Amino acid sequence: TDERKQELSNHYASVVSRITAARARRYAKTGVDTPVTLLGASKTMPAEDIAFLMRDCGLRVAGENRAQEFAAKYDDVIAAGGEYHFIGHLQTNKVKTLIGRAALIHSVDSVHLAQEIGRQSLAAGVTTRVLGEVNSGCEASKSGVAPADARAFFAEIAAIPGIELAGMM
């Protein structure tokens, strides 16, 4: 509906305004202007809403936290002209759903998962960009490696064919 589109547009503009103000404050304080990429989490949102934000409001990157939802929304999001990232916990049996589709997988929390992503990527003839997940608070309820193990974890992931380690989460 037009009302829903206006609501989405207003909310998006508000978020962009807050980001712009925060960047300006940081620049005034430090003299450093750091680029920011806004990722719209599409959790529970219909594909039409994400497509509208991309097509009409300027959102460039969306992220989904469930592999099945990612697959269901993929065509609409890509048709709107944006990047689609996977931002949730990923099980090895769901990897195939994302290969060749996800511009970036944010949540690689084990070497075993990275190896499966690499294997599936090679089979599809693509390279998959990933972020290694660090559990900075060492919380049992969170995924990722302990900070003390991060360097070795990243080195191991970076050596896996079919994967490009793009950073950490």
For each predicted feature, which ranges?
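Conserved alpha/beta-domain cores
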Residues: 1-169
